[in-house]
Amino acid sequence: MTAEKLRIGYIPEHFSTPLHFAIKHFGLEADIKPFPTGTGALTASLKDDSIDVAIGLTEGFVADLGKTNAKQETPAYKLVGTYVESPLCWAISVGNKSSVNSEDDLNAKRVGVSRIGSGSYVMSYVLADQKGWLKKSKSPFEVVPLGDFKALRDGVNAGDKADFFMWEHFTTKKYYDNGELKRVGEIYTPWPSWMIAARDATDKKLEVMAEKLNQGVAWFREHQEESVEHITGTMEYSQEDANAWLKTVKFADNVRGVDSGVVEHTISILQKGGVLDDKNGGVKGMVAISRSERGH
């Protein structure tokens, strides 16, 4: 990292609200860059040094780091923080004219994902594992990388490129309400849903960033009306959905550091789901700042 502002990549959804508050109210000095296609794009940008820090989905980071370690390559980044403690509800969506009516109809179907290695990709394997559809000889689905959320919606409708896709519930709900999509199920992540990754865990600016994010989280909790105004005013969420989401989400009290046990648990589930093998490098190959080491 240079002496310049931190370059922070984030996903432009409601979960980004404390980051915006950290900048607006507490003077976090950062150049922030939105990545609407998700965590797979964040990991690619960490690797090519176009960002210093990324706030993204736990499964996307752990899957990518595990695959990097399996190739015996040095990871370009590691995990340095925990952003959201609560699990993520992934809604399972099909096109509005689809004959699919339940999760059980999805075996061997075409799954649309934002990109290989993204959360939407990884969670399709977690779904397959929970349903007992995993076979060593073949993939449980035909995986179709489509890009951003709009491309996924188009892909199950007019584009007819995929049979279903998975995306965060509240981001998707508007399209159930307007009839564009049909909801056939849901799956929760079996781990805290959002983490923070960085290229250089020794950079002192990360400590300042964590302090400012903690303040942003506290502001978010204490000023829920402003939080709803930000979410509905800058993103495509209704007031009703924003308020409903506020009741379900739990941001970390202190974002600095990662619970090694959480990463171990995530690795074990991703191994069981066929996303990672036993050469994934374990926690040491993924975590740069653990909660036990972060200090006070």
Predicted regions and their residues:
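Secondary-structure end/capping motifs
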Residues: 203-277
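Structured segments of extracytoplasmic/periplasmic soluble domains
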Residues: 45, 64, 109, 127-131, ...
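Eukaryotic N-terminal targeting leaders
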Residues: 1-3, 296
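Predominant activation on well-ordered alpha-helical scaffold segments within soluble catalytic domains
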Residues: 20, 61-62, 93, 125, ...
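Pocket-lining segment of extracytoplasmic ligand-binding domains
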Residues: 59, 146-233
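Short, glycine-/small- and polar/acidic-enriched structural segments
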Residues: 3-144, 163-169, 183-184, 188
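Proline/Glycine/Serine-rich low-complexity intrinsically disordered segments
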Residues: 97-101, 200, 204, 255
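Conserved C-terminal helix/tail region of periplasmic/extracytoplasmic solute-binding proteins
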Residues: 271-296
